[in-house]
Swiss-Prot record:
It comes from Mycolicibacterium smegmatis (strain ATCC 700084 / mc(2)155). One of its GO terms (biological process) is protein localization to plasma membrane. This is Chaperone protein DnaK. Induction: By stress conditions e.g. heat shock. GO terms for molecular function: ATP binding; ATP-dependent protein folding chaperone; unfolded protein binding. Belongs to the heat shock protein 70 family. Acts as a chaperone. Residues 606-615 have a biased composition (Acidic residues). Gene3D superfamilies: 1.20.1270.10, 3.30.420.40, Actin, Chain A, domain 4 (3.90.640.10), Substrate Binding Domain Of DNAk, Chain A, domain 1 (2.60.34.10). Keywords: ATP-binding, Chaperone, Nucleotide-binding, Phosphoprotein, Stress response.
């Protein structure tokens, strides 16, 4: 049976893990790292770079490098490169394709099944878009799992049968979640979840960037925000400074040649940022995590003292101010240090993949829907059918009626959120139920059913009880992609995968050819050098000329893009090189009798096996 992987598709970094002998293993990528930057770049030569290579060239290719696309998932955002528009799903799919490739390389087999994690507070459109990204990448998405739930699964599975309450505080690169879970006897149950989809480490980086821009403007009068390349360098320096301030009290930010003044003189940026100053300029961001924490405690109906363990997830939780705040909020409870905040979510996803594949037994994962779901009723009111923090999968029905006499149809508008007025919430989609027989208002019976599957994706049905007519919608308008568009993107991704394979093959062939040309040229030059030194070449000039011709053909082929021509030229050069080697060997053999006759009897040409010993050392040993 083919194995399934667990993928943490993060804002700044992504991780893939797989079960090996029942234990989760984080897979290192082709660059040797266990985390892959969620960065995609379109090089000007047509190559698509993903991960660290994409991040490395960001400064010189700002407009064609995309990062933190997770913040746009589930929206109508797109980016145009070379007259082609790319959606967040397509960019995310590039990252997933790399993770898939790296996992396949590690396992030595094809991977099609995956469990992908999302922030607990992701709405339906964002979940649907994440699933579509998986499909575009050629993955069969077995399940969409909430990140804190996956983390709790990874943390709590081996904690015995005693029931425990775990708080997961998840601050990633672009999103924040806090969840309360109960674990015991193989059951992982989410009690409550809350969060902010637009709060993460990127926001802390942005504050440092703003601070640096203001400092530089104050000293030089130049506004760096107008220089894209300078801003990219500032972002990279800000991320590095943030990381350094987690272990140091201050850090030096030094960027030579950041820009030039009016007289074209180069200017340097050199600033010292202390941890205290960093915490001051980001205090309001930290404070935004308090309300979701308090909401979760309230929704779960427990007190802070009931929490047994605190698990920190996401690289941003390494900031000392975050750790201190969590300790303060939990009444001094020390966060668990036994999990890697960057990897624990992928590990949990791999375990859930194992559960779905039957590799992990006796584990039940009970997740919740993070936001209430309902429809708009008379007066623009949001009538909730499913309350937030309801365990999923779930199904709820409610009967409604018409607002006007002889109303022939009803418009069902589906919303997600907590506001009392429907329009203040997120509109997921709408559809119409037609063919209602003429009747006074209040008489027709319209049954509306909400069905949320285990991925947290919503299906809504409206049925006229009188006629039996019904209409169903699978909410996907929020993602903005039709089945045809997804199919097109899948084909596009497959085509690019083939392009990438060809490009890698082309690079390998080109490198081999260049290496062969260099080595052969060097060898021919040595032979001619020996002849000019008076020793005489052991090879006829005619043979060397043939090699020269083959080298020239190979060089000419390398100037073009025809790989078959390069291969053909390389084969020809290989044949001539072998002929050259054979000629040298034969010439050397021919010289042997003459060279050996000075040394005595013909019988002396027996070969003796012996070690070479240094003469002086030999004398000392005698």
């Amino acid at each position: 049976m083919a194995r399934a992987v667990g993928i943490d598709l993060g804002t700044t970094n992504s991780v893939v893990a797989v079960l090996e002998g029942g234990d989760p293993v984080v897979v290192a990528n082709s660059e040797g790292s266990r985390t892959t930057p969620s960065v995609v770049a379109f090089a000007r030569n047509g190559e698509v770079l993903v991960g660290q290579p994409a991040k490395n060239q960001a400064v010189t290719n700002v407009d064609r490098t995309i990062r933190s696309v997770k913040r746009h998932v589930g929206t109508d955002w797109n980016i145009e490169i070379d007259d082609k528009k790319y959606t967040p799903q397509e960019i995310s799919a590039r990252v997933l394709m790399k993770l898939k490739r790296d996992a396949e390389s590690y396992l030595g087999e094809d991977i099609t099944d995956a469990v992908i994690t999302v922030p607990a507070y992701f709405n339906d459109a964002q979940r649907q878009a994440t699933k579509e990204a998986g499909q575009i990448a050629g993955l069969n998405v077995l399940r969409i799992v909430n990140e804190p739930t996956a983390a709790a699964l990874a943390y709590g599975l081996d904690k015995g049968e005693k029931e425990q309450t775990i708080l997961v505080f998840d601050l990633g690169g672009g999103t924040f979640d806090v969840s309360l879970l109960e674990i015991g006897d193989g059951v992982v149950e989410v009690r409550a979840t809350s969060g902010d989809n637009h709060l993460g480490g990127d926001d802390w980086d942005d504050r440092i960037v703003t601070w640096l821009v203001d400092k530089f403007k104050g000293s030089s009068g130049i506004d760096l925000t107008k220089d894209k390349m300078a801003m990219q360098r500032l972002r990279e320096a800000a991320e590095k400074a943030k990381i350094e301030l987690s272990s140091s009290q201050s850090t030096s930010i030094n960027l030579p040649y950041i820009t030039v003044d009016a007289d074209k003189n180069p200017l340097f940026l050199d600033e010292q940022l202390t941890r205290a100053e960093f915490q001051r300029i980001t205090q309001d961001l930290l404070d935004r995590t308090r309300q979701p924490f308090q909401q979760v405690i309230k929704d779960a109906g427990i007190s802070v003292s009931d929490i047994d363990h605190v698990v920190l997830v996401g690289g941003s939780t390494r900031m000392p101010a975050v750790t201190d705040l969590v300790k303060e909020l939990t009444g001094g409870k020390e966060p668990n240090k036994g999990v890697n905040p960057d990897e624990v979510v992928a590990v949990g996803a791999a375990l859930q993949a194992g559960v779905l594949k039957g590799e992990v037994k006796d584990v039940l994962l009970l997740d919740v829907t993070p936001l209430s779901l309902g429809i708009e009723t008379k007066g623009g009111v949001m009538t909730k059918l499913i309350e937030r923090n309801t365990t999923i999968p779930t199904k709820r029905s409610e009967t409604f009626t018409t607002a006007d006499d002889n109303q022939p149809s009803v418009q069902i508008q589906v919303y997600q959120g907590e506001r009392e007025i429907a329009s203040h919430n997120k509109l997921l989609g709408s559809f119409e139920l037609t063919g209602i027989p003429p009747a006074p208002r209040g008489v027709p019976q319209i049954e509306v059913t909400f069905d949320i599957d285990a991925n947290g994706i919503v299906h809504v049905t409206a049925k006229d009880k009188g006629t039996g007519k019904e209409n169903t919608i699978k909410i996907q308008e929020g993602s903005g992609l039709s089945k045809e568009e997804i199919d097109r993107m899948i084909k596009d991704a497959e085509a690019h995968a083939e392009e990438d394979r060809k490009r890698r093959e082309e690079a390998d062939v080109r490198n081999q050819a260049e290496s062969l040309v260099y080595q052969t040229e060097k060898f021919v030059a040595e032979q001619r050098g020996a002849a000019s030194d008076g020793g005489g070449s052991k090879v006829p000039e005619e043979t060397l000329a043939k090699v020269d011709s083959a080298i020239a053909d190979a060089k000419k082929a390398l100037e073009g893009t025809d790989i078959s021509a390069i291969k053909s030229a390389m084969e020809k050069l290989g044949v001539e090189s072998q002929a050259l080697g054979q000629a040298i060997y034969e010439a050397t053999q021919a010289e042997q009798p003459a060279g050996g006759s000075d040394n005595g009897a013909p019988g002396d040409d027996n070969v003796v096996d012996a070690e070479v010993v240094d003469d002086d050392a030999g004398k000392e040993n005698k």
